[in-house]
A protein has these predicted regions:
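Short strand-turn segments of transmembrane beta-barrel domains in outer membranes
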Residues: 165, 182-216, 228, 235-237, ...
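C-terminal beta-signal and adjacent terminal beta-strands/loops
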Residues: 628-634, 660-712
Length: 712
């Protein structure tokens, strides 16, 4: 189990790797809380952590899990989120090498996240988990995050695993895994209240983010935590009213010394107006205005999961875990549609119709797995992970069109997709030379059966996909500080309901992922370098003009990621961080566009931050840079009159944050952060975003934030 104290740091963690008695946790909690107010005593009680069996290749998504991990990986802590002035999940990811974000709202409600050049729209090529449970609407048939039921205030950290996890975490793992880790239940009952107020230059009303959490252990065997997050207001543009409510409850129940149940329940409701893109002329006139008055969004989701953990008395150590999860979700996009000529989404033309896309999702899954450790104290060790998963998805997929001038509503699409997906996986981490060298072969098999029904045409078609997905990771501890690693894994993205379009014959998108790199870790100083390559077969690409998908064939994504953190021994109050990504993402299919850059991919990405602590205050200057990118496969440089094609210019954004504890003792603390995002008011934009794909989509300008957080 995990718990945290008033400083927000996880003191003892358990779960798949180890089990602690409640007495030991109480001792650790008391020790760490007294340490806030007093020096360490001579006779301290120390809780030793012994990791014997590991049931997850990514562990608990802690900083400690990164050091020897056999792939490129970044963990963003709550402290880093605060100091870099991140106001949303997508904003927190901006400085991670290989991640690019199209921030269409400034509120984080509908993030568009690209990993290593994969398409960003609705984060459909990024596999998101929350506490290890799939977050996406449908892991197989609809990977696009057109509901993103997560808010930054409820997170403790974010784990971005770019390589090495495909065997256990699939499908849709071409770009790796992003695990959102919620705040753990504290051992001593704790309440947290925070309010974050953001004012945008040019905005009409502020955006307010209120968060409340209370929880702890009610007895030696039962813990409970309740959370609520309310986001309300506007961003920097007209037609951007936002109202989000996010409620979570989690519980832990120790059935015995060897058995535990963890439960999670969430209700998420979001409504937001979508200001849409602007024509180049309107953008130059006033980038804060909106020309898409009919564009709106609503999303609702009820999610749950129950996990049973049982330590077993065989091998040197063994553990059984059974995870069940599910959700019932609804979402509705509404947007203006022009059917009178020109591009349907041209923001300079008036809409003739209003389209809606109501969709409903019912998902259920169960995943039992076993972890077994052999060879304790020997020169050769083995950590086996064997698991299987069943997921059922029921998707209703509609499209309606209503003339603004009046008339009957048409239903161009009325589809249904029922999916039964079975997966099995096995891996064995073999430790050689006293775990100096770790080699992990693994295999995942996916068997997906889809039944597609076009209710309007009264047609039904079946589609079955079976794929064997091998993987191999290697990590070598050169010294206590240096680790070299390499991995190769085959990844899958199952056929999507929007791709099938009634044919029932579309195949999967497949890719081979390769990485080789090295990592240095010494106290707070670290460095990582990774070369990566993704060989993608049969990549499908959305064409907004025809609203169909094209198979663009083979694509190649390759590059170099660098990241470093330096804390000088002579000046520990200073912390310097930097990252760089070089990405060459190209079309490889024979034809006129072979060798061209994939749309929306920047070759160069930089991230940086510098924090200096003095007189009880932390000051941080941070930022990111992305080079220019193209909009189409032909790599057209000149912008056309509508803004549908043309280069997207490079941009550089600076942020500033000042944080200090206004009050702190062993019973509680009150912390204040003052931030300025986009310090120099860089004006930049994106293209090609979902329901408004034509024109320039403005990114947020300068904003000012006051954040107060009280824990007691």
């Amino acid at each position: 189990m995990s718990y945290q104290n008033l400083d927000g740091k996880v003191r003892v963690r358990a779960g798949l790797s180890t089990t602690y008695s409640v007495l030991a946790i109480a001792i650790a909690s008391a020790t760490s809380m007294s340490a806030v107010a007093a020096p360490a005593a001579k006779n301290e009680t120390t809780v030793m952590e012994t990791v014997v069996v590991t049931g997850s290749v990514i562990g608990n998504s802690d900083i400690e899990d990164v050091k020897e991990y056999p792939g490129a990986r970044t963990v963003i802590t709550r402290d880093q989120i605060e100091k870099t002035a991140a106001g949303s999940i997508d904003n927190a990811l901006q400085r991670v090498p290989g991640i690019k974000v199209q921030d269409e709202s400034g509120t984080g409600v509908l993030p568009n996240i690209s990993v290593r050049g994969l398409k960003a729209s609705r984060s459909g090529h990024a596999q998101f988990l929350m506490d290890g449970v799939p977050l996406t609407l449908a892991p197989y048939g609809h990977t696009g995050q057109s509901i993103f039921p997560a808010t930054l205030s409820m997170l403790d950290r974010i784990d971005i695993v770019r390589g090495g996890a495909a065997v256990q975490y699939g499908p849709n793992n071409v770009g790796g895994v992003i695990n959102l880790v919620t705040k753990p239940i504290p051992y001593t009952w704790q309440t947290e209240i925070s309010n974050r107020l953001t004012v945008f230059d040019g905005g009409d009303a502020p955006l307010n983010d209120f968060y409340l959490r209370t929880g702890g252990w009610l007895s030696d065997t039962f813990a409970l935590q309740l959370e609520g997050n309310f986001l309300k207001g506007e961003s920097f543009r007209e037609h951007s009213d936002t109202d989000v409510k996010n409620f979570q409850a989690k519980a832990q129940w120790l059935l015995s010394d060897t058995q535990e149940i963890q439960a999670f329940l969430q209700r998420y409701d979001a409504e937001t107006q979508m200001p849409g893109a602007l024509s180049p002329q309107d953008y130059e006139q006033d980038r804060h205005q909106s020309k898409r008055p009919y564009d709106d969004y609503e999303g609702k989701s009820t999610r749950w999961s129950v996990k049973y953990i049982h330590d077993l008395p065989f091998a040197d150590s063994a553990e059984l875990e059974v995870l069940t999860f599910g959700h019932k979700s609804e979402r509705l996009f509404k947007w203006g549609f022009n059917s009178a000529g020109g591009h349907w989404a041209d923001p300079a033309l008036p809409a003739t119709d209003v389209r809606t896309s109501p969709r409903e999702f019912t998902v259920y899954g169960i995943e039992p797995k076993m972890a077994m450790y052999f060879g304790e104290g020997k020169s050769v060790t083995q950590n086996w992970i064997v698991g299987t998963r069943y997921v059922n998805e029921d998707i209703d997929y509609k499209l309606t069109q209503t003339p603004i001038a009046g008339g009957a509503t048409k239903v161009p699409r009325d589809w249904h997709l029922d999916t039964d997906a079975f997966a099995g996986y096995v891996s064995n981490e073999i430790g050689l030379f006293n775990d100096t060298l770790k080699v992990t072969p693994g295999l995942r098999v996916e068997s997906v059966r889809m039944t597609f029904t076009d209710r309007g045409k009264k047609q039904t078609a079946d589609n079955k996909v079976t794929e064997w997905l091998p993987g191999l990771t290697v990590a070598y501890n050169v010294t206590d500080q240096w680790v070299t690693y390499a991995n190769a894994q085959k990844s899958l993205r199952a056929p999507q309901i929007a791709y099938i379009r009634g044919l029932g014959e579309e195949g999967s998108e497949l890719a081979w992922n390769y990485e080789v790199g090295a990592r240095y870790t010494q106290d707070a100083t670290s460095f990582n370098a990774a070369l990566y390559r993704i060989d993608f077969e049969d990549q499908l690409q959305w064409q907004s003009s025809t609203q169909t998908f094209d198979n663009i064939g083979k694509t190649l994504h390759q590059g170099l990621e660098l990241s470093a953190r330096y804390v000088p021994e002579v000046l520990p109050a200073l912390s310097l961080g930097a990252s760089y990504n070089y990405l060459d993402a190209t079309l490889e299919e024979e034809g006129a566009n072979k060798g061209n850059q994939l749309p929306y991919t920047s070759k160069h990405q930089l991230g940086w931050d510098a924090t200096y602590a003095f007189y009880g205050m932390d000051t941080t200057l941070s930022g990111f840079y992305f080079s220019d990118s193209y909009t189409d496969n032909a790599n057209t440089s000149a912008e056309d009159a509508t803004g549908a094609t043309g280069k997207v210019p490079s941009y550089m954004v600076w942020n500033f944050n000042l944080g200090t504890d206004l009050y702190k003792d062993d019973k509680g603390k009150l912390r204040m952060n003052v931030a300025v995002n986009n310090l120099f008011d860089e004006e930049y934009y994106f293209r090609g975003i979902d329901t408004s794909p034509v024109g320039r989509y403005p990114a947020p300008g300068r904003s000012y934030t006051l954040d107060l957080n009280y824990q007691f």
